[in-house]
Each structure stands twice: as structure tokens, then as C-alpha cells.
């Protein structure tokens, strides 16, 4: 049996790739810290992303295998993943040149629960080194596919300036169902600012000084792959521009919405002006 697809696209992806490439398209200088194998697929990934970001910090290794993923996009834009085998592709602390943090404004973990061996003391070390150099720390969450448990990062939140989980991820970690209670949980654990991505309901922001919710932009979604990563990239872009938190969240919502109108995890966004023009034409 065979199923005919309307379109097939080969592209790079993954949380950190989507986030860094979108940041670069928005006009920021972005580097990727990751392992990448030396296979033909690894070479194609490198060729794809080096058009946009600094790849000098990538660690190419013969003994690792980055997983290939088939993403099936449904008519409503939702997606299903078929993940291939992988081996030894998780970044480790010894792979990182921490001196780069001395000239870095933001260090982002994309995403907790999917960092391999770094999910633990490794990412704690990264964030502590980053903060010691004066960088802002940002973290997204992912599904707990390795069953690390909801308490896995309770010692890390105090080293996170901006935590940006999805509603479902926040619900899993906190055991709460109301947005204020979710955010308060993370704030009490030490996170300084919390942004909860709520999909079709927009995003919720809370810190010690302000609380607000921004609605979602109504768009026809072709593919929601990477929309959360694009949201984070849009938010970080706003931070780097020195915008207010409300403007950062609004821009982030728009960035995710624009991404949803194209196929692929980082192919929809072309630049800051595109997002600003989208904001002019769309009110929420």
C-alpha cells in the first residue's frame, strides 16, 4: 500500500536548529552548540544550516549518528513524527568551549528533557557558566520521553532567567491546570520570568512584577512543526532588541504564527520586517 503526499521537503530541524536559524533570519547572530555526525545526511544538514548560523561550534564525530525524522503533516497542520535510530549524538560538557560565553548575550537550552547526557548536571554547568559571564539564560521544555520525571530540573530553575514551556509541558511538571498556578510554581522554584505557550490561545506571561496574556493570531496553519521554537526565537529577538516583555511576547506569538503558514520547522520566517508587517495587518 502507498500513500501519495502533496509535497515532500528535505530540511534540517530539531528545537535548537529551528530556534537558531529563525534567530538568524530575524537579524541576530546565532551559533549552535551540538554534535553532528559525518555521514552524508550530516553533511547535508551542515550545508543547510551554515547558510544562516555560525556552525564553528558544532562537534563533528564519526562515532555519532543524528536521527533522521519523517514528519507527516495532517490537513489541519498537526504533525506526527517517525524517528529513526540514533547513536551518541548528545552534546556533553567537554564538547563546549565555555570561553564563547564571554561574548554571548543569551544562552538558550532547546530543550530540557531532550538534551541527552546534558539533561542534569551538564545543563546546570552550562547555565552557571553563562550567568557568570553575564549572559541571559533561556530554556524551553519538551516531552519527557525518557521518563526523567517532573522533578528532574527543580535544581535548575534558579539558574533560568526566562522559562518558556508549553501548556502541556508546564502541566506535566507542575501538576497544575491553571496558568497563574503553573507560573507561580516555576517562580517559587527560582525562575525569574515564565512564559507559557498556549497554542491556539496565545501565551501567558508572569514574573514578580507583571502578569498578562496575549491572544493567538488567527491564521490558516499548514504545519505547526517548530512553531514553539520559532516563538522562543521571536521572544529572544525581542529581548536582544530591548523591548518590553509584552512586546516580546506579542512578537513571539506572531513569529510562531508566521511559521505555521509554511511547511518545515524554520522555513516560514524570512526576517524581522516580515513579522512587523504581519503585526500591522493582524490585530488580536
What positions do the PLM features span?
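A glycine-rich helix N-cap at a beta->alpha junction
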Residues: 48-64
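Glycine-rich phosphate/adenosyl-contacting loop at the front of the ribokinase-like
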Residues: 1-33, 40-50, 221-222
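Gly/Ser-rich phosphate-binding catalytic loop and adjacent alpha/beta segment
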Residues: 59-68, 89-91
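Short beta-strands and strand-loop turn motifs
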Residues: 82, 104-112, 134-141, 164-167
